Amino acid sequence: MASNIKIVFFGTGGSWPTPIRAMPGVGIQIDDVFNLFDCGEGTQKQIMKSKWSFMSIDNIFITHFHGDHFLGLIGLVQSMSFNNRTKDLNIFGPRGAIGIISNAINIGYYTLRFRINVYELEPDKTYDLGKFLLKTTLNDHPVPALSYTIEEKDIIRVDPQKAKELGIPSKIIEKIRDNGTYEYRGRKYSIDEISGGIRKGRKIVYTGDTKPMQKMADFAKHADVLIHDTTTDSSFEPAVNQFGHSSAKQAARIARDAGVSRLFLYHYSPRITDVSPLVDDARAEFQESYASEDLMEYEVKVKH
């Protein structure tokens, strides 16, 4: 069956927190698997304002180790311990993650009550994480930094007429789809016997901080959702590019070239209070551009 995929923007600002925006943190829930992308200062408090529980987080993916993207880990991990978490927590990041995260989670006096598994990921790799595939690429930022893609695995469509002709009930169809074959009433059925083609899995791309780069358009090709660094409007492009960031117009060009379904503007400069000029800039290049806001939720619908 198709998974339920939801995105929650816990924080959409960059550099430092403001009264209207929290630091970067994006939740992507795939059924009962909770993934957090970046964990800036105050992320746990933002999670408390949402429908999520910070105790349910399974995986945390850090794009890079500038403070606005990971300093929230310190408080989050300690709060998990105070609340008697026992299940493992997986934390992923670019080169240097093991040392930096080890230092962060060992600040201060507390008892760590659960196992933390830290993984350093290589760029341009694909990792099978069960419910989904995680893909990485090196982006253009002054420090080691990765962009991530979550890809739902392709799903085999079932032809109901074929299943009906074979006398296979719906509960058995799912077992055949999950296992490839399944024995029912003394006969082994194959998925090929009831297949109606392939439904491509949904794809979400989270860039983290990056200058615009053509490689990102290839990385985000035909994504359902692209969440791209849009630090400012086009009038400040030279300045933000110098520090490894993108403007809204540049992000929209990437979205257009990639052929994505929807672009979310993200990681606004703390000097920006009104994002409407950024949306206008972006929509001049790519109409399906939208401003993300703190605690906004978005459901990624199934492709038909």
Swiss-Prot record:
InterPro entries documented for this protein: Metallo-B-lactamas, RibonucZ/Hydroxyglut_hydro, RNase_Z/BN
Disulfide bonds: none
Enzyme class: hydrolase
Cofactor note: Binds 2 Zn(2+) ions.
Listed transmembrane segments: none
Record keywords: Endonuclease, Hydrolase, Metal-binding, Nuclease, tRNA processing, Zinc
GO MF terms, alphabetically ordered: 3'-tRNA processing endoribonuclease activity; zinc ion binding
Gene3D superfamilies, sorted: Ribonuclease Z/Hydroxyacylglutathione hydrolase-like
EC number: 3.1.26.11
Amino acids binding Zn(2+) 1: 64, 66, 141, 209
Keyword hit for Hydrolase: yes
Catalytic activity: Endonucleolytic cleavage of RNA, removing extra 3' nucleotides from tRNA precursor, generating 3' termini of tRNAs. A 3'-hydroxy group is left at the tRNA terminus and a 5'-phosphoryl group is left at the trailer molecule
Quaternary context: Homodimer.
General function of this protein: Zinc phosphodiesterase, which displays some tRNA 3'-processing endonuclease activity. Probably involved in tRNA maturation, by removing a 3'-trailer from precursor tRNA.
Protein name: Ribonuclease Z
Lineage: Archaea, Methanobacteriati, Thermoplasmatota, Thermoplasmata, Thermoplasmatales
Gene that this polypeptide is encoded by: rnz
